[in-house]
UniProtKB/Swiss-Prot annotation:
EC number per UniProt: 3.5.4.28, 3.5.4.31
Domain of life: Archaea
Catalysed reactions listed for this entry: S-adenosyl-L-homocysteine + H2O + H(+) = S-inosyl-L-homocysteine + NH4(+); S-methyl-5'-thioadenosine + H2O + H(+) = S-methyl-5'-thioinosine + NH4(+)
Keyword presence, Acetylation: no
MF GO annotations: 5'-methylthioadenosine deaminase activity; metal ion binding; S-adenosylhomocysteine deaminase activity
Descriptive protein name: 5-methylthioadenosine/S-adenosylhomocysteine deaminase
Keywords: Hydrolase, Metal-binding, Zinc
Main function: Catalyzes the deamination of 5-methylthioadenosine and S-adenosyl-L-homocysteine into 5-methylthioinosine and S-inosyl-L-homocysteine, respectively. Is also able to deaminate adenosine.
Keyword match Metal-binding: yes
Species whose genome carries this gene: Thermococcus kodakarensis (strain ATCC BAA-918 / JCM 12380 / KOD1)
């Protein structure tokens, strides 16, 4: 299978050079980026007036939570979770989660996301949806034991069961990740065992850390130290760890994260909506910490649009620091592409020969994207997910000219509505 993308504005290489060029894809790799490629291809896409971008990498989400979108808004995090989200999640069956995963996958395909790091439950069912949709999914079962030893054993058993189920799929696009929920919901015993298992099985770890001031207070009262120091003291951290949020980090925390090569997944939309706080982006970047971008779940955002998330990230840090030079467009664009790929150890996030063919083609023949003075600026400040026209993952076209090819869109939406009624 080969694809030739003709006449596009291509965002090329690590430096984000915008060049007028063609892109040739063979199998699942980009093999050539140059002008006037004349080789025959199975599919030819005319990208005149379009931007050919790396696909976006959502480094923290809970994709099935689209089922809960709009059910509880304008509330503090713990009230939102305990009184509204967790009670409804208790009603979720494996099949309901799968329906939610299809809805999330459809939304991501439509907005140019090609890879996502997910945390939820019944992840073997999510994996089935990811395979059908054609996306790349890094899937973690969210483990919570609340200090109960019996529950610790149960959670570890379930994580290993889901790991085995996902590995049996034998797909290069679907990967299991260990996902202890957070230091305030997980015992030290659980965290230590996760660290051991991740090393044994060569898996990544993702965990919510320092999201709210309430969490900081709870952990400090319980252990006499910050969540990051706690994780460092028990030997949990490493360059295979991706922490979500990292809002309330002091200078010591930041140095610890930098020393271990930990990635932080920034979720500006969710952090603003839940009034959690503002991640110290500049301090983290200056310390050399890898920062990716995530939407969080679409019940706390309330969508999975990475183009919108880039704009939120850029604007949040400018106004918070009263400095318009902070979180410039190129820095934020890298967070949504290259940096996410680095965290996932994925040869993607860049359009260049030899890289995986994970691509979003954005239609710039729109009034809000003209004139084309600066492509990266337009993507960060002017574009939105509805401008994405074609999505390619692993050399396969998932959406072409606005038509999703891998999923029955009407069926996905109809099934989601039916499940939502049962959860209300």
């Amino acid at each position: 299978m080969s694809i030739l993308i003709k006449n596009g504005h291509v965002i090329y290489g690590e430096n984000l050079d915008v060049v007028r060029a063609d892109v040739l894809i063979e199998s699942n790799r980009i093999v050539s980026v140059e002008r006037n490629i004349n080789e025959a291809a199975d599919t030819v896409i005319d990208a005149t007036g379009r931007v050919v971008s790396p696909g976006f990498i959502n480094l923290h989400t809970h994709s099935p939570m689209g089922l809960l979108r709009g059910l509880a808004d304008d509330l503090p995090l713990m009230e939102w979770l305990q009184n509204h989200i967790w009670p409804r999640e208790a009603k979720l069956t494996p099949e309901y989660v799968k329906v939610g995963a299809y809805l999330g996958a459809l939304e991501m395909i439509r907005s140019g996301t090609t890879t996502f790091l997910d945390m939820y439950f019944h992840m073997d069912k999510v994996a089935e949806a990811v395979l059908d949709a054609g996306l790349r999914g890094y899937l973690s079962y969210g483990m919570i034991d609340l200090g109960d030893p019996d529950r610790t054993e149960k959670e570890l058993k379930e994580a290993l069961r889901e790991m085995e189920a996902i590995e049996k799929l034998n797909s290069e696009r679907v990967h299991f990740v260990f996902g202890p929920h957070a230091p305030y919901t997980c015992s030290i015993a659980l965290l230590k065992e996760v660290r051991k298992l991740a090393s044994e099985h060569n898996k990544l770890i993702t965990i919510h850390v320092s999201e709210t001031m309430a969490e900081i207070g709870q952990i400090t009262e319980r252990y006499g130290k910050s969540p990051v120091v706690l994780l460092d003291d028990i030997g949990f951290l490493g360059n295979d760890v991706i922490i979500a949020h990292g809002v309330w980090l002091d200078s010591r925390d930041i140095q610890i994260l930098a020393r271990h090569g930990v990635t932080v997944a920034h979720n500006p939309g969710s952090n603003m909506k839940l009034a959690s706080g503002v991640m110290p982006l500049e301090k983290l970047l200056n310390a050399g910490v890898n920062i990716g971008l995530g939407t969080d779940g679409s019940a706390s955002n309330n969508n999975l649009d990475m183009l919108e998330e880039m704009k939120l990230a850029a604007l949040l840090h400018k106004v918070h620091n009263l400095d318009p030079t902070i979180a410039d467009a190129r820095t934020v664009f890298r967070m949504a592409t290259q940096n996410g790929a680095k965290a996932l150890r994925l040869n993607a996030g860049i359009i260049k020969e030899g890289y995986l063919a994970d691509i979003a083609i954005i239609n710039f023949n729109r009034p809000h994207l003209r004139p084309i003075n600066d492509v990266i600026s337009h993507l960060v400040y002017s574009a939105n997910g509805n401008d994405v026209e074609t999505t390619i993952v692993d050399g396969k076209i998932l959406m072409l000219d606005g038509e999703v090819l891998t999923l029955d869109e009407e069926k996905v939406i109809s099934e989601a509505e039916k499940v939502s009624e049962k959860l209300a």
